[in-house]
Amino acid sequence: MEGPEIQFSEAVIDNGRFGKRVIRFETGRLAKQAAGAAMVYIDEDTALLSATTAGKHPREGFDFFPLTVDVEERMYAAGRIPGSFFRREGRPSTEAILACRLMDRPLRPAFIKGLRNEVQIVVTVLAINPDELYDVVAINASSMSTQLSGLPFSGPIGGVRVALVADEHGSQWVAFPKHSQLENSVFNMVVAGRVAGDDVAIMMVEAEATDNSWNLIKEQGATAPTEEVVSEGLEAAKPFIKALCDAQADLAARAAKPTVEFPVFLDYEDDAYAAVEAAAAEKLAAVFQIADKQERDAASDQLKDDVTSSLAGQFEGREKELSAAFRSVTKHVVRQRILKDQIRIDGRGLTDIRQLTAEVEVLPRVHGSAIFERGETQIMGVTTLNMLKMEQQIDSLSPVTRKRYMHNYNFPPYSTGETGRVGSPKRREIGHGALAERALVPVLPSREEFPYAIRQVSEALSSNGSTSMGSVCASTLSMLNAGVPLKAAVAGIAMGLVSDQVDGQTRYAALTDILGAEDAFGDMDFKVAGTSEFVTAIQLDTKLDGIPASVLAAALKQAREARLHILEVINSAIDTPDELSEFAPRVIAVKIPVDKIGEVIGPKGKMINQIQEDTGADISIEDDGTVYIGATNGPSADAARSAINAIANPQVPEIGERYLGTVVKTTTFGAFISLTPGKDGLLHISELRKIAGGKRVDNVEDVVSVGQKIQVEITKIDDRGKLSLSPVIAEEEGAENAEVAEAAAE
């Protein structure tokens, strides 16, 4: 875009051998009636417009800052027409909602405290390269437009995604990676922060291991995202954030409006705080030593009523100030006790975890279920399995068009003992579900290993701190109960942070397994999920202007100790996948030649419909010739497989068939027998006893050797088409072998 009115600045992001990215900030041409507007480009082929506006008057009756952040995904940005019935954009996609949360979380603490004018930030995706991710660009765009708007905002704020990408030269943290680069990465994180002196203070982190992480680490030797590696990633993000903040500051210095003086409504005046502190501080210290949440809340509410009633005459008409001051005094009392005495609200030490319980198979008929409890937080996880054609279809700007693992999180009002609206999920529920989903994706089996669509639902039945991390634990239990062969168990823990001035110095205390009150009164909610070996997901929210990376690194190490303890509890409840529920569908995969797909389908679908009608199975065929067969029971699935093989794979072996095979390989656990070209089966070492006349076989080579011909029968075909064999022994030969074995024994 060109024009004499345009002013711009650029941030050049140097990724070394992975090339450079250019982030360009422009203003002056578009959305001129907004308080602040900015166009932000990445490499000139992805463009976002951010506009910030503010209400002219404070919102009456509001005791919070009314900030709204929205993302408008335009399908024309990717050269597409929306897939909805009316062919226009409707409600925001999940990706857009998550992008809104990414922007809101670092921006909100940067506005002046007490602002009550409504502020709205709208980011519109105008053009996008399908290989780009726009969410981090949106963080910078929203910060830039707000910097230009004249609002009391302590920016700029820079946001960057860094991915640990592996290539032939090793692993490197790459800024602003593309979708194609993420396929070779083991971990990626979105980090937002601001320049604080000579350092960068971190304000928000959203991180995850990728679905390829396990294979890259275990099979290709890629660097695992341990706590130390993740800490290095936070440090690697700092210079990129500084470059983005410098570019924003440069443009703001030339084009920003003067900061407007907005009315600020402080929660209370100093005299109200002093009066409440004198009346309540000592009693609050005793109240917040009560361990039980409901008893503690009742005592706190009673004390609040007593204090406000006693001070009502002195502060007539200022009851709201007294209420806010009471909360502030409570916060100070709780924080000082933690920092000075190292004792928390419920009497725990800084690193102590509440009592844990884990139970599986808690509901009848469902495919998998579990309950995980951590103190007063109780999560029920329920797993449902179905054919892959039931996976979620996605119509968004992302190149990802389908998702086989779907995690839904529900937070009903009764979970906190309150009343409220129930129904469609709110942004918070969508965000928590997405976090739990990201934590578990790296350990899911591949589509080939487990050809099922998986829907996981987390029901927050009781909440007192970190239901999202409880959902991760409950989901691990539930999926194992459903028979999902997870590569490893995953657990999550919520860390908190308290900081305050003690004896003239700023002290930090990291808290393990925070309560709801510690979340409310603390400075940070830091959620960490992972296996026993590495981190799979992180989410950081802070109420401060930023947190030193060294403090976060220490909290990461503290979280690992807690995670390992929780994994022990999970493993004591269930450590291996159970058998599939009798109520779960049986899904098997058959590979057919691509040129046989038409024959299986038949003219106008006649053949495939006939097979489905005859067997009761449900059949779907992929373009690569993979056929997925789903049925309510095993015999139906086997009948459909036989019918398909009769058409497309007439030489495919069936159970009970006999072959004269050739030993092609021996191992410690048996011998592989070639039956037909391209089709082998396993003759397990336990089956070799029949050849040895019932004698125990310790060494496979003592009985068979490579190249030997042997008559075998197919005894089993598993869901992946692998064959189990048994030797066919004539009666005379079997008797003779038995006599030889007896003679050898004598």
From Swiss-Prot:
Residues 585-644 form the KH domain. Mg(2+) binds at residues 519, 525. Residues 656-728 form the S1 motif domain. It comes from the Bacteria. It is found in: Cytoplasm. Its cofactor is Mg(2+). InterPro entries: ExoRNase_PH_dom1, ExoRNase_PH_dom2_sf, GPSI/PNP, KH_dom, KH_dom_type_1, KH_dom_type_1_sf, NA-bd_OB-fold, PNPase. Gene3D superfamilies: GHMP Kinase, N-terminal domain, K Homology domain, type 1, Nucleic acid-binding proteins. Keywords: Cytoplasm, Magnesium, Metal-binding, Nucleotidyltransferase, RNA-binding, Transferase. NCBIfam families: polynuc_phos, pppGpp_PNP, PRK11824.1. HAMAP family: PNPase (MF_01595). This is Polyribonucleotide nucleotidyltransferase. It comes from Arthrobacter sp. (strain FB24).
